[in-house]
Amino acid sequence: MKKRVLSVGQCVPDDGALLRFLSSHFDVELVRSPDKEDALKRIRTEQFDLITVNRKLDADYSDGMDVIQSIQQDPDINTTPVMLVSNYPDAQEKAVQIGAEYGFGKMEYEKPEVVERVGKFLK
């Protein structure tokens, strides 16, 4: 059975790269969400195995940390693991501090440790 991943705030090319990475290692369906409002609505009404949030949302360049914080503060939706997509280690640390799993950067897709990190939720 396919695992479902919600991708929040990626541009179309980056979502394509994320889908190629994920589908080369796991049986996944990628669902795109452009912004915080849409993401929160989808999380409340659909089941996901993993949520990835871009550091800066492509639709309006808002802060992905706000999305993560909104998810983590809502007990009705904070059970799904969330990962930040960012190449910046300081951003990853901040995301972990507010409740996310340690994520990955767009330049790290094929690193074995990233495959293993994501695999905890998609195998």
Predicted features by range, described:
Residues 78-89:
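A short, hydrophobic beta-strand element within the central beta-sheet of small alpha/beta folds
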Residues 44-46, 72-78, 98:
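Conserved phosphotransfer cores of two-component systems
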Residues 52-71:
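Conserved phosphotransfer microenvironments
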Residues 108-118:
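C-terminal output helix
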Residues 2-13, 18-22, 51:
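Conserved acidic segment of CheY-like receiver
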Residues 63, 87-104:
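Alpha4 helix (beta4-alpha4-beta5 surface) of REC/receiver domains from two-component response regulators
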Residues 34-50, 56-58:
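Acidic, metal-coordinating helix/loop segments flanking the phosphotransfer/catalytic sites
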Residues 27-35:
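Short hydrophobic/Thr-rich beta-strand motif most characteristic of the beta2 strand and flanking loop
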